[in-house]
Amino acid sequence: DGKWMVKLKSMKAGGPYTLNITGENSIEFSNVLLGDVWICAGQSNMELPVRRVKGSKKEIESANYPQIRLFTVDHSANSDSTRNNVNGEWLMCNPVTVDGFSAVGYFFGRELYKEINVPIGLIDVGWNATRIEAWTNRKALMRVEAGKKEVEAYPNNSKTSDERGMINYNAQMLEYQKAVKNGDKTQAKPNLSRPARRDPSSISSLYNYMIYPFTSYGIKGVIWYQGEANSKSKQNAVNYRQFLPAMISSWREDWRQGNFPFLFVQLPNFESELFWPEMRESMLQTYLADKNTGMAVTIDIGMEKDIHPWNKQDVGYRLSLQALDIAYKQKGIVSQGPIFKSMKIENTEAILSFNNIGSGLQSSVKELVGFKIAGVDKHFYDATASIVNGKVVVYSSFVKEPVAVRYGWENNPKCSLFNKEKLPASPFRTDNWN
């Protein structure tokens, strides 16, 4: 069928080189680099382009990095089959090409390049408002109870959706034809809706057409920014702690490159009625359970009224710290902010210990904020918190016998616990109450 593949042995990073392929004819590729390739996947916050971030004009003007290459994958979805190729091309990073490229991906790649000084390739694989089920293959979905139910229901749901779409289209077409016959030229001609299998929210549809084509391609790792679309119910957010590990393990299986680093963004602060505390907890649990995952905490750089925060520079920077630590094994890197370790109750106080304290704990404001404490009645009160000997002591005069503490357990919390490397603590809770 004219398809073939050549696998080259690993070579020293560098370039540009020329690649010659000779058979009955010859093909020459020039300006080829050898370096590390990262997949940049997720929904709209991964897709958000450089032109929409804070200070975009200055960022774009200074984006001259010939050793960074950018590849944007075309939007295409199919639940029923995979494809082997995508539409797109490698572009040299400059002010023209970076303008519409993933901001998180670019800032991540830029920070990496500055630190390791090898060519960096970034593959932008984003689609707004998409849920994790669309990015996960059927095999992995079957490992999760909620995913298994979707896989088993898909044939009927797809058929029903397509039939409903045709009924609606035919009804709209009759109305349109009637209007035209009566001389009404204001109505727009109806269009057929997308078949269910082509819907980017359908199971495995984005994995099949946007991820699978790269599974034979050598990569260093993945960065992932997604979760908003899976936070519309508490159960969906809780299920994510099964979906995310299942997706990660299946991608690693399909790439056949071992347990490559998978780095993701924990959702930031944002005022909404979604279930972001539970989603952040699902992400935290995934991070703690898999040593080759990294999590960039962003609880301090979201925006109260905008689900697409403008500060993507710090997101990329924090992901790059995870990469330098996990993927490149750089010594002396503090890649993470404080992560809750344990709680000890002494009289009316809860004493909290943390991992990843770096050079020590500190508050970004005069007094620690974001902590709540509860007794056996499960009623949480705002707490007074202070840093004492590398631990956090939490107290409230309303709680004489504390049993649980929560930190940042809101959609849009005010949080101030950091390490001295200025990396924020992840939100957490010590209880498991519903």
Residue ranges and their predicted role:
Residues 1-434:
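Cell-envelope and extracellular/periplasmic
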